[in-house]
Amino acid sequence: MRSGIHPDYHEITVIMTDGTEYKTRSCYGEPGATLRLDVDPKSHPAWTGVQRMMDTGGQVAKFNKRFAGIGTRTK
C-alpha cells in the first residue's frame, strides 16, 4: 500500500443497546474511541420481527408542519 493515502485503522469499543461491549477495528474516531449504538441487530425491527414506529424528537410532526402547504395549490 502507498503510505499517506489510507485512513488510520485502529481499535475501538462498540457498545450495543443492551450494554454489551466488543472491540473491533475501524476508521471511526480516534484509537480507543467508543461507539454507542442506538439500533443494533438485537433491537432492529428487520431482525426481531417486531414492528414499531420510532418518532425521535417529533421528526414526522416537524416534516408534516414544514411541508403542509405543498400540493394544496388551487387554480
Swiss-Prot record:
The protein in question is named Large ribosomal subunit protein bL31
Q: Name one Pfam family in it.
A: Ribosomal_L31
Q: Which family does it belong to?
A: Belongs to the bacterial ribosomal protein bL31 family. Type A subfamily.
Read off the PANTHER family from this record. Answer: 50S RIBOSOMAL PROTEIN L31, CHLOROPLASTIC, LARGE RIBOSOMAL SUBUNIT PROTEIN BL31A
Q: Does the keyword RNA-binding apply?
A: yes
Q: What does this protein do?
A: Binds the 23S rRNA.
* Source organism: Gluconobacter oxydans (strain 621H) (Gluconobacter suboxydans)
Q: Name one GO biological process term.
A: translation
